[in-house]
Amino acid sequence: MNVDRCWEQYYKTLKLIYLEENKETCQREIDHLVDTAIELKEKTYSNAVLDLGRQFREVCPKARIMWKTSSIAGNFYPPISISDIYSPVIANVFDQTTRLECRRQEYSLRMPLQEEPNFTGIQQHAQVSDCSLVVSLININRYKTTMPVVKQVAENLYATNLYFNGAQRRLVLVSTENIPTMQDDPTKQMSVHSANKINKILELGLLKLTSLSYHSEGSNTAIDTYRLCGWIPDISSINEFNFLKVHKAFSRGECLIAMGTGGFVPKENIFGVKLRKYHDYAVLDIDMINEVVTLRDPLISDTLLTINFDSIRKYFLQVYCNWDSSKLFMFTKDTQIFYSDKKFNPYQTLAGKPTFYLKNNSDRDEYAWVLLEFHLDKNNNTTAYLQEIPDRISTVRLGYNDNSAETGFQLIKIRLKPKQCIWYFCYSSTDKMLTFHTYSTSSDVVFVRSKMPGCDFDVTECAILPENIVPMQYPNHSETDIYYLASIDFSIEGEPGITIITDMVVCLETDDDLVNFQMFHWDDLDFNSPIYDEFYMNERMFEKKDLPLTSGERYRIVASTARPPISKGYQCAVSGINIHADYPCSYKLRESDVRYNSMMFKLPHVFTLASTGITKISLVNRNKYNKVFMRIYPQTQEDYRYNYRVISADTGEDLVKPGNNIQKLYGGIVIKEFLVSDQTNLELHLSFQDNGRVPVELKCQLYVGSVKIITLS
């Protein structure tokens, strides 16, 4: 029996149990492995198969997520330890064969990696743009315990575990067979200079992971160090850097430090070694007495730079720290979510975004850090961040000023008071798997995804239906045509009579739409008395702040646009402050078509109304009992007066009190709910008078709402 084939089938089954949802398929493959183990009679293989059976029985959703986020740019990096590598055939199952790009013509040869046993120190190759990676190698070589373990799998094939995509031990296979080599001098290769071959292998592994090229861009030392050894990345501006505070941690071996320049460096050589633009330097020492920092340029291994604090602040832009979580915290926990751009981002507000709370359940102060990490995949041009939610979420727009939002990592540090709870929202500019790493000094500190409690916030999102688009006017602004967009039933539930200071926003999907909304009391069916009379249109988003609303009351929100909307959906969100905290209240939003008085069955009808007679509309009701509401909207700005009757088509009896000399209000002509019984069919009679001599015809829209179905005759 071919041992390598047995191991290859083992690794295929290992992959299957985490990626295949069909348990029967997985069980058949495991049973086959058991038969193979019995026949092979090899202890290591038998133990591995037994452990695989245990993994299958204990597989959990979190483990599946880790496996399903293993693919990056055609390579598959499973979350398994290098201690689980038993055969080189593992490379056949977990394909990581993509070769690094090299654009240097003088390095056109491809040869196996050569060692440099006599080289002193660690030095970046001049043609490889990975200064941050080499600085990371310089730093972690000073702490041998942080060095990743590298295992040889076969000739010119090595394996290591790196930290990325939410996992602490993703398998990275590194081929050292095809290293760009100088055509004119085969002793020179594009590789970091080091006597330790492990540094060369780690460079290859990280370059393959992040850029698939020897010409990488966009990384920094904090991120590269995290991926190599898992120490928490902390990126800060040089102006925020506290030399004294960090020096204490640095001297205790709790952190690694690097510094990066920006676009401004001195032209002259004033430090013995000329500073380079946009370049990272390893920090080897901080002398608080003389206020100087000792740095190493990764391109020059045999020379140190000594720079005083003032010059550091003048010529350096950022500080990169990496913290040893095992020395700072006792507890860690990871939380994963998939952020859907389609689901969470159609509206540029915080409403509807994923929300989390960080809470200290203990009776004393506790420290907690939360590290957001977005997963590498086919699209890494992503902005992602976690941000504290203000008291009034609905009116706060998206935006984050921290450059770390574009690096794939963001670190939040906080000291939590006893029982303190802080709410956060999450944003990503694209579809992205995100991991939140929580580090804390107590198990009483929790980071949980949850919807915010009711009184603080509520939101509804709905589609815009094409038939909604009917010209209307606002009260006191009848000269301006607007288009009905949507209406929402809004209430504040709780102890009646409590004043809630409320913010409200209606947001559309595109900036090309101009939007407004008005609010009315529930019984104001004519929409003649808006709670505030403020008519103007805003691009995409209209918001009102500090509305003093009352619990126990119901309101109607009517949104409109300046022209037929381009957006296919809208969002309405509210938040507020309960000034009587002893009486909890909650918001409730529900889409409710106010044109039909929120009734279940809706019958729209467009007709023409002439000034020369009475227009009759016949309606069929086949129900023994029904409740009916009507709204008639003549599409005109003229101040005509209207008459209406609703009668039984069978007896001619009036079913509602006739309306005479009625003025069309903002909500049109409203015929309030009335009862219909005994399968009575209806007739609506409508007329108006025009004082002019020329006959006039008006286009009208009829909205009939009912408890049970009604149709046109």
Curated annotation (Swiss-Prot):
Q: Keywords assigned by UniProt?
A: Hydrolase, Protease, Thiol protease
Superkingdom in the source lineage: Eukaryota
Instruction: Please state which protein family the record places this protein in.
Output: Belongs to the peptidase C2 family. PalB/RIM13 subfamily.
The record ties this protein, via InterPro entries, to: PalB/RIM13_Calpain-like, Papain-like_cys_pep_sf
Name of protein: Calpain-like protease palB/RIM13
Keyword field contains Ion transport: no
In this protein, which residues make up the domain named Calpain catalytic?
Answer: 74-325
Q: Where is the active site?
A: C131, H279, N308
* GO BP annotations, alphabetical order: proteolysis
Known function? Required for the proteolytic cleavage of the transcription factor RIM101 in response to alkaline ambient pH.
* Record has Signal as a keyword: no
PANTHER family given for it?
A: CALPAIN-7
The taxonomy runs: Eukaryota, Fungi, Dikarya, Ascomycota, Saccharomycotina
One MF term in GO for this entry?
cysteine-type endopeptidase activity
Q: What is its EC number?
A: 3.4.22.-
